[in-house]
């Protein structure tokens, strides 16, 4: 039996309004619980279009057929008009998710975090996180205990900023296994649960065809030597590719692969490490990567 942490990122208004209810229904039918990370502020994701001038991002958009994958409402959100606020407009959906799954903060403004957080000072970052946590807690009526940085944009600055909120864990980086990042003070910080497996948009059209993806991913899961964690997106697996996701769950069950919330992957003893800026194939720009230092 192989246990895989299932992380669901919700980046946009449409992903929340349409994708999350579909995913909740699918997960219920398969008796699966997951960790769902919500963006709760304005949907400005269309402002990423300026990145098309970067060849790596343009190629990713072309090979993943982004217009079909996400829809033009997502690709243009917040460009010619102010982005719609996601959280309170979809409060009932978010509350329903929190009844059955582990719910955490993805971002206040996903676009702002992904595009600008690397240049923010620490107080700006703390204020942004606080705004998102406060909004999500108002919606679900209980404390938020986990978070996942938008676009995996995380480094030591992010690690230090999030310590102010005393969360149970964060999932801010890519890596191999849960660990505790060292703080500037030399003490271990809040547990990190890295994503270990590629996402759909990172590999489709580059490493694998869409129709072969599920078999390819299950093979990667079985070969994962660390603690497997897989991320899906409400805008992808909850919308255009929901049938592919259903097929993945069926095939996973047949192969003895089970999915769980990320918190179930935590153990009492975790290695020490750091979150450093790095790059991975299929994703444009830098992102947080795990660097192991020792054990604690």
Swiss-Prot record:
Signal is among the record's keywords: no
Signal peptide (UniProt feature, chain positions): none
Gene Ontology terms for molecular function: hydrolase activity, acting on carbon-nitrogen (but not peptide) bonds, in linear amides
Keyword line: Antibiotic resistance, Hydrolase, Lipid A biosynthesis, Lipid biosynthesis, Lipid metabolism, Lipopolysaccharide biosynthesis
Record-listed E.C. numbers: 3.5.1.n3
GO CC terms in record: membrane
Pfam families (alphabetical): Polysacc_deac_1
InterPro entries reported for this sequence: ArnD (IPR023557), Glyco_hydro/deAcase_b/a-brl (IPR011330), NODB_dom (IPR002509), Polysacc_deacetylase_ArnD (IPR050248)
Catalyzed reactions per annotation: 4-deoxy-4-formamido-alpha-L-arabinopyranosyl di-trans,octa-cis-undecaprenyl phosphate + H2O = 4-amino-4-deoxy-alpha-L-arabinopyranosyl di-trans,octa-cis-undecaprenyl phosphate + formate
Pathway: Glycolipid biosynthesis; 4-amino-4-deoxy-alpha-L-arabinose undecaprenyl phosphate biosynthesis; 4-amino-4-deoxy-alpha-L-arabinose undecaprenyl phosphate from UDP-4-deoxy-4-formamido-beta-L-arabinose and undecaprenyl phosphate: step 2/2; Bacterial outer membrane biogenesis; lipopolysaccharide biosynthesis
CDD domains linked: CE4_ArnD (cd10939)
An annotated GO BP: lipid A biosynthetic process
Segments forming domain NodB homology: 2-260
Family of the protein in this entry: Belongs to the polysaccharide deacetylase family. ArnD deformylase subfamily.
Function, as annotated: Catalyzes the deformylation of 4-deoxy-4-formamido-L-arabinose-phosphoundecaprenol to 4-amino-4-deoxy-L-arabinose-phosphoundecaprenol. The modified arabinose is attached to lipid A and is required for resistance to polymyxin and cationic antimicrobial peptides.
UniProt name for this protein: Probable 4-deoxy-4-formamido-L-arabinose-phosphoundecaprenol deformylase ArnD
Gene name per UniProt: arnD
């Amino acid at each position: 039996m192989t246990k895989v942490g299932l992380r669901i990122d919700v980046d946009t208004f449409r992903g929340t309004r349409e994708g999350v209810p579909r995913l909740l229904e699918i997960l219920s039918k398969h008796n699966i619980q997951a960790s769902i990370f919500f963006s709760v502020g304005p949907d400005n994701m269309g402002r990423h279009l300026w990145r098309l001038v970067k060849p790596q991002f343009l190629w990713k958009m072309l090979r993943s057929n982004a217009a079909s994958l996400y829809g033009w409402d997502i690709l243009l959100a917040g460009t010619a008009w102010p982005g719609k606020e996601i959280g309170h407009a979809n409060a009932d959906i978010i509350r329903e998710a929190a009844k059955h799954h582990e719910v955490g903060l993805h971002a206040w403004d996903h676009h702002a975090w992904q595009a600008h957080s690397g240049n923010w000072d620490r107080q700006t970052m703390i204020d942004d996180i606080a705004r998102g946590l406060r909004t999500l807690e108002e919606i679900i009526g209980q404390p938020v205990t986990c978070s996942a940085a938008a676009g995996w944009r995380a480094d030591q600055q992010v690690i230090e900023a999030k310590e102010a909120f005393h969360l149970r864990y964060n999932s801010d980086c890519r890596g191999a296994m849960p660990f505790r990042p060292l703080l500037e003070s030399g003490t271990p910080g809040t547990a990190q649960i890295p994503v270990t497996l590629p996402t759909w948009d990172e590999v489709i059209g580059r490493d694998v065809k869409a129709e072969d993806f599920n078999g390819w991913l299950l093979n990667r899961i079985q070969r994962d030597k660390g603690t497997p964690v897989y991320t899906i997106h409400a805008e992808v697996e909850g919308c255009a590719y929901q049938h592919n996701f259903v097929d993945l769950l069926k095939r996973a069950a047949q192969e003895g692969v089970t999915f769980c919330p990320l918190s179930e992957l935590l153990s009492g003893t975790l290695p020490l490490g750091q979150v450093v800026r790095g790059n991975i194939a299929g994703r444009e720009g830098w992102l947080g990567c795990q660097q192991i230092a020792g054990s604690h």
